[in-house]
Amino acid sequence: MQRVVFPNKILPYLLVAPQIVLTIVFFFWPASQALYQSVIREDPFGLKSGFVGFANFSAVLSEANYLNSLKVTVIFSVLTALLAMGVALLLATAADRVVRGKTFYRTLLIWPYAVAPAVAGMLWLFMFNPAMGTFAYMLRRNGFHWDPLLNGNHAMILIVVAAAWKQISYNFLFFVAGLQAIPKSLIEAAAIDGARGTRRFWTIIFPLLAPTTFFLLVVNTVYAFFDTFGIIHSVTGGGPARATETLVYKVYNDGFVNLNLGSSAAQSVILMAIVIGLTAFQFRFVEKRVHYG
């Protein structure tokens, strides 16, 4: 391997300086502020503050609303990840078999990823709006009373569908890349041995997609935890009756709406610990490679 030699010793540091500055400004500084705010308590006007240690964490972990948000987040994350990955794998498998127009279909399937989360949420809200939504009208015609504004289960279904639709394109790209990396000789050998399409998929293709699937499982879980705020805020606002209030949305409610900065900061630190744990878990196990032979 040829070693890269820079003409100036300062040049490498200058090249990485913008990224270092961005990391300090947008990660280390906010993280340090969250850690500081999580161990102090301020008065409602922000004039006085005092050190309280882990009292904010103790109050958060014993709060019924926080435990409810944790349950909602787990349910929402599992459903979103399974739906987004399942549909993406189905579409990737179908697109991989297309001979003519393959690039065109793949481009169409990638478009939803470019849609902003709030826009994606409003799109699905309009379609399932109880008063004027097309899909809501179809459900009523079939005797199903759809009302995500009052029914918590309906609201959960709506944000899961919207969040999964937004993430399908991302998963689709990785699954297509994983399918293309599988040696065709293995599939052809299985076909010669008499294995049908479904059996070839479950015994050969899907096991070889294990690294990609595991990687996407972690990514989709992190996505559902942290990147769906815009969808929830635009569709349900955490309601009805906190039925869709995830951990991230509760941080927003406590910090920016109720101005309880100590509790909000403690929740942020807990979320930061969760994402660090998920990332470490991913780096620990995703390095396992599949060897073709």
From Swiss-Prot:
Keywords: Cell inner membrane, Cell membrane, Membrane, Plasmid, Transmembrane, Transmembrane helix, Transport. One of its GO terms (biological process) is transmembrane transport. One of its GO terms (cellular component) is plasma membrane. The chain crosses the membrane at residues 10-30, 72-92, 108-128, 156-176, 204-224, 261-281. CDD domains: TM_PBP2. Belongs to the binding-protein-dependent transport system permease family. The complex is composed of two ATP-binding proteins (UgpC), two transmembrane proteins (UgpA and UgpE) and a solute-binding protein (UgpB). Part of the ABC transporter complex UgpBAEC involved in sn-glycerol-3-phosphate (G3P) import. Probably responsible for the translocation of the substrate across the membrane. PANTHER family: BLL4140 PROTEIN, SN-GLYCEROL-3-PHOSPHATE TRANSPORT SYSTEM PERMEASE PROTEIN UGPA. This is sn-glycerol-3-phosphate transport system permease protein UgpA. It comes from Rhizobium meliloti (strain 1021).
